[in-house]
Amino acid sequence: MSTEFEQAVAALHGEGVIAYATEAVFGLGCDPDSELAVQRLLAIKQRPVEKGLILIAADLVQLQDYIDLSQLSGEQLARVEASWPGPFTWIMPARATTPTWLTGQFDTLAVRVTAHPQVQALCRAFGKPLVSTSANLTGEEPARRVTDIGELLASKLAYILPGEVGGQANPSEIKDARTGAVIRPS
């Protein structure tokens, strides 16, 4: 593991918020199991907890502690799995044990299995998914390069992992896993 990855993982274990490249934009991430880390991320983003968050993972196995796959039919799960890894976020039933700092006011959770090699490696090195949201203040344009991360935002982060965004022009499409309805087009 590179020193950069070690620093990013250490920041995550220290309940910090990091920035890292995803398929389309730089993301802000933290430990989904740390309420303190999530509250820090929400404060940086100026985002209300009620809106809920997205988890990004290296594979479906990393998400199984947070989502209730038993509430999906075989066909629904097959549709989700056919889109991954990739820039597709699915709203899925949350487990009863999934904290409200992740789900917000919902009984569901937005999840994605990334195709971005650096994010896959980061999730594997950390051993679980990350909370993932775009690296910007709510309402502003998301960062597409490290240099786009403003000084104000950068000063609030525990670490910025150098990297390149993937080839996606827009943030991930969000769909409801049970209905197939598009919540946010790509």
From Swiss-Prot:
Q: Which UniProt keywords apply?
A: ATP-binding, Cytoplasm, Nucleotide-binding, Nucleotidyltransferase, Transferase, tRNA processing
Cellular component per GO, a single term: cytoplasm
Q: Outline the extent of the YrdC-like domain.
A: 2-186
Q: Name one GO molecular function term.
A: double-stranded RNA binding
Entries under PROSITE patterns matching the protein: YRDC
Q: What is its EC number?
A: 2.7.7.87
Q: Does the keyword Kinase apply?
A: no
Record's keyword annotation contains Kinase: no
InterPro entries reported in the protein's UniProt record: DHBP_synth_RibB-like_a/b_dom, Sua5-like_dom, TC-AMP_synthase, TC-AMP_synthase_SUA5
- Any single GO BP term: regulation of translational fidelity
Q: Which transformation does this protein catalyse, written as a reaction?
A: L-threonine + hydrogencarbonate + ATP = L-threonylcarbamoyladenylate + diphosphate + H2O
Localization in the cell: Cytoplasm
What is the protein's known function?
Answer: Required for the formation of a threonylcarbamoyl group on adenosine at position 37 (t(6)A37) in tRNAs that read codons beginning with adenine. Catalyzes the conversion of L-threonine, HCO(3)(-)/CO(2) and ATP to give threonylcarbamoyl-AMP (TC-AMP) as the acyladenylate intermediate, with the release of diphosphate.
Q: Of which family is this protein a member?
A: Belongs to the SUA5 family. TsaC subfamily.
This protein is called Threonylcarbamoyl-AMP synthase
